[in-house]
Amino acid sequence: MAFQECVIEVAQDQAEAWSDALFDLGALSVSVEDADADTPDEQPLFGEPGLEPKQLAWNRSRVVALFGDDADPAVVVAAAANQLGIDPVPAYQLRAVEDQDWVRLTQSQFEPIRIGERIWVVPSWHDAPEPDAVVLELDPGLAFGTGSHPTTRLCMQWLEQNLKPGETVLDYGCGSGILAIVARKLGAGDTVGIDIDPNAVEASRYNAERNRVEASFALPESVSEASYDLVVANILSNPLKLMAAMLSARVRAGGRLVLSGVLERQADEVAAAYAPWLPLTVWRSEEGWVCLHGTRGAQP
């Protein structure tokens, strides 16, 4: 089956209305994009979690609607414009989208990723690249974190170089469970992953089972407030600052804290947020991101 893609450039305040109208009139899918993407005028829109976006669409928004080959996009666009009280009907672009083996196409875009000296993240449709590699079998999909982002790589490299056998580990904001899983594969003891997203918890459990690793994954309210030898959190700077007291309390006396998801320019303010409990320094940076680490001293 072939498809038709219809692209309409609209004003920022019309993007949501156009999306709703096209979908109601039979579009198979509708998305809104920045019309200036990949140009000097590209407009960042969404910030970190905990910070409300200043606006909900780009100044020059592009509405992209997908139709089946039996649909008449011209009729649909005209009907949507009439429904919205817009006259004349705006210009739009049409292009044919040929049906493909979408699974094979998607798989071809993901190759094994080497992290550090021995760690490899390998999709299920690939073989392990080295016989003595520490292999994480992980497919892109249900939740976040396949090892491709610098912050994930930094945390995994830290674990490879610094984790001590038998240490207990808390992975806060576990996403796909990748850090908890690699910690267990590197010799960690009891390991717990926490995430506020039930889908992430589900994905982490699935990935741990697939990798033949024993680790616990749960929502925050389901986990006791125990302390750990190592706490790792790869989130973003604003949530990390808000959770400074809580995350620090999860680190036992003499234990270590590892944070990432922090830009180089944000490192000092994140370290300052944790200063009442433990000192944090930059362990390593990559592509503008940093990994912070520190040891909690003996508690009074």
Curated annotation (Swiss-Prot):
Report whether Transit peptide shows up as a keyword of the record.
Answer: no
Xref: InterPro entries: Ribosomal_L11_MeTrfase_PrmA, Ribosomal_PrmA_MeTrfase, SAM-dependent_MTases_sf
The catalytic activity, as recorded, is: L-lysyl-[protein] + 3 S-adenosyl-L-methionine = N(6),N(6),N(6)-trimethyl-L-lysyl-[protein] + 3 S-adenosyl-L-homocysteine + 3 H(+)
Domain of life of the organism in this record?
Bacteria
Annotated GO biological processes are: methylation
**Which GO molecular function entries does the Swiss-Prot or TrEMBL record give?**
protein-lysine N-methyltransferase activity
Q: Which Pfam families match?
A: PrmA
Q: What is its EC number?
A: 2.1.1.-
Leading EC class: transferase
- Tell me which residues bind S-adenosyl-L-methionine: T152, G173, D195, N234
Q: Where in the cell is it found?
A: Cytoplasm
Coarse class of the primary localization is cytoplasm
Its keywords, alphabetically, are: Cytoplasm, Methyltransferase, S-adenosyl-L-methionine, Transferase
Task: Identify one Gene Ontology CC term for this UniProt entry.
Answer: cytosol
Protein family per UniProt: Belongs to the methyltransferase superfamily. PrmA family.
Its biological purpose is as follows: Methylates ribosomal protein L11.
* Name the UniProt record assigns to this protein: Ribosomal protein L11 methyltransferase
